[in-house]
């Protein structure tokens, strides 16, 4: 590895919506610069996780260093820092953008700008990045590069007269992209003499070497064997291994300002090396850390329980291992009378929750029951103290609480004009407040609503997709807490409250939710030998109730004569048996019943 001057380094990332061809473009860049040998090349080279490949999304960041000889005959080093495109991971996106000087904005020429792309473009503009628009998939018969270019100009305000037309799949326009990165993306600042500072944009846990930290050197230089300090956590380590990523790790002895690389230093957990933290040298520390570090706060919570109680220890191990890789995941032990022992887990958002659950089931072979997701409520008690509640069964009793506040988000939806009515209806039904509506082009519209997060965490995204036939996209951000008239809805089966089915709902909706839920449970809970009542209650007031009729054996089958007293005797005997069974019998609530809460149509 030759030492490249700072003026010939280019750091860039790719911003694109899911399915607009980001991973394929990254593949082509790696291929054409000869970074990855032809025989090792596979589709979506940078998406390492099976889950990423299957869902076609990028979850964890990757980075790759490419050597490229430009038309001017100079040799350049291009560092591609890949970003996840989903709204749940927007903090990771912002950190990886902070490590770059430029970004390729990849837009599908047959579809146009989507909400997620917009959100990430705004992040890139905040970080003062040079943005190069690329119209991808121009080989498709449905491609309309002119329309999409006009849309980008209209929506983002970028000049698209020079937009590169490309097709990553067919390999068209890839050289133009490489040239424009060299020409347009500014080189990093030459700050070799400053004290060493580097920005962590990703970290993951390796079973043999501990945590591997991916970082971009902002100032100064660092050598193997140096003692480093992480400024946010204050932890200190000695670098055992230093290297660059060409996607595989290649060891080097020194990295300087502008370069991107990785280090290993026998770090035990990812929490010690948080994304966004600043690395400096213990011997000559920097005065202040790089700006922009925040701790990722979980927004959505749910209970995870093993279906088999013997798997509790395995679930604990699996969560510990995932936590090593995922600093945003939080969990604590929880017991439930209905489900036994399990964990209450916190996630960044819905996609994050689904991915964690899938990884637990897939990579650790666990069979899990999940409770309905809930958000963090702020409850002010009568003593004036503020309690954060993320589990409905822990809500203080009505006598002890003064008010409940819930998190609100601002949702921006981009949709073809035809579906505006359907989406407005959806938002109204979820207690949404209309804020703004903008027309981008004649056919595409942005709708802006403020909604309670609790109304979005269950199935809002699925509903959005189904009502717009898959064309709408959404992006959300937290805007703070607001007071609302919220109540706790308890579900009782056979007279016993089932804590895993308890939920916090708005008083106006409580009756409908209670009705819908009891009806749904009536279908899902199997019949028993005795009659099972299912009730929905607020406090001591029952607001909805259903009964599952008993299975009964025909005890009169043997009676042929018309003697009524004989029949009565048998029926009384049966009734007594049922009564005794009801007193001591337990009701099995199947897994589907717990998931029913998610599938409720709040209409």
UniProtKB/Swiss-Prot annotation:
GO biological process, one term: translation
One Gene Ontology CC term in the entry: plasma membrane
One MF annotation (Gene Ontology) recorded for this entry: ribosome binding
List of residues binding GTP: 19-24, 136-139
Reactions this protein catalyses: GTP + H2O = GDP + phosphate + H(+)
Keywords: Cell inner membrane, Cell membrane, GTP-binding, Hydrolase, Membrane, Nucleotide-binding, Protein biosynthesis
Family listed: Belongs to the TRAFAC class translation factor GTPase superfamily. Classic translation factor GTPase family. LepA subfamily.
Protein name: Elongation factor 4
Organism: Microcystis aeruginosa (strain NIES-843 / IAM M-2473)
């Amino acid at each position: 590895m030759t030492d490249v001057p700072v003026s010939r380094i280019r750091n860039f990332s790719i911003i694109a919506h899911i399915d607009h061809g980001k991973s394929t473009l990254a593949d082509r860049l790696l291929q054409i610069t000869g970074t990855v040998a032809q025989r090792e090349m596979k589709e979506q080279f940078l998406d390492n996780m099976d889950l990423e490949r299957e869902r076609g999304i990028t979850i964890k960041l990757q980075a790759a260093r490419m050597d490229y000889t430009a038309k001017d005959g100079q040799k350049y080093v291009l560092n591609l820092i890949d970003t996840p495109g989903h709204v749940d991971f927007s903090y990771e996106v912002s950190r990886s953008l902070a490590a770059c000087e430029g970004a390729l904005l990849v837009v599908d020429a047959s579809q146009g700008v989507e909400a997620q792309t917009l959100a990430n473009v705004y992040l890139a503009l905040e970080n003062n990045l040079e943005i190069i628009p690329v119209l991808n998939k121009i080989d498709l018969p449905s491609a309309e590069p002119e329309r999409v270019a006009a849309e980008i100009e209209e929506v983002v305000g970028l000049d698209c007269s020079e937009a590169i037309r490309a097709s990553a799949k067919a390999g068209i326009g890839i050289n133009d992209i490489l040239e424009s990165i060299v020409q347009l993306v500014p080189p990093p600042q030459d700050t070799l003499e400053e004290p060493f500072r580097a920005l962590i944009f990703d970290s993951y846990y390796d079973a043999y070497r501990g945590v591997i930290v991916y970082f971009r050197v902002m100032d100064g230089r660092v050598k193997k064997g140096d003692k480093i300090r992480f400024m946010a956590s204050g932890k200190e380590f000695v670098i055992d291994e230093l290297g660059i990523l060409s996607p595989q790790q290649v060891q080097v002895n020194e990295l300087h300002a502008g370069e991107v690389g990785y280090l290993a230093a026998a770090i035990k957990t990812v929490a010690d090396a948080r994304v966004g933290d600043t690395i400096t040298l213990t011997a000559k520390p920097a005065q202040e850390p790089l700006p922009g570090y925040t701790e990722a706060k979980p927004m959505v919570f749910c209970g995870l329980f093993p279906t088999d109680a013997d798997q509790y220890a395995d679930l604990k191990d699996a969560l510990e291992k995932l936590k090593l890789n995922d600093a945003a995941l939080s969990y604590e032990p929880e017991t439930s009378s209905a489900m036994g022992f399990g964990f209450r887990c916190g996630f960044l958002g819905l996609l994050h929750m689904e991915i964690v659950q899938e990884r637990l089931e897939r990579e650790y072979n666990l069979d899990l029951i999940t409770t309905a997701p809930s958000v963090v409520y702020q409850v002010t008690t009568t003593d004036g103290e503020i309690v954060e509640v993320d589990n409905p069964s822990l809500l203080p009793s009505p006598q002890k609480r003064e008010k409940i506040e819930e998190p609100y988000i601002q949702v921006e939806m981009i949709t073809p004009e035809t579906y505006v009515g359907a989406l407005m209806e959806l938002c109204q039904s979820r207690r949404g407040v209309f804020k703004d509506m903008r027309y981008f082009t004649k056919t595409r519209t942005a709708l802006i609503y403020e909604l309670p997060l609790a109304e979005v965490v269950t199935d809002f995204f699925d509903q959005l997709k189904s009502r717009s036939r898959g064309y709408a996209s959404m992006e959300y951000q937290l805007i703070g807490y607001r007071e609302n008239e919220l109540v706790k809805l308890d579900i009782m089966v056979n007279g016993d409250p089932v804590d895993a089915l308890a939920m916090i709902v708005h008083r106006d909706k409580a009756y409908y939710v209670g009705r819908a839920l009891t009806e749904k449970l009536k279908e899902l809970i199997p019949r028993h030998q005795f009659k099972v009542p299912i009730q929905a209650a607020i406090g001591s007031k029952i607001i909805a109730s259903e009964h599952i009729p008993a299975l009964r054996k025909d005890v009169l089958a043997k009676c042929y004569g018309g003697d009524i007293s004989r029949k009565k005797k048998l029926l009384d005997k049966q009734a007594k048996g049922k009564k005794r069974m009801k007193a001591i019998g337990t009701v099995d609530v199947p897994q589907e019943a717990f998931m029913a809460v998610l599938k409720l149509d709040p209409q």
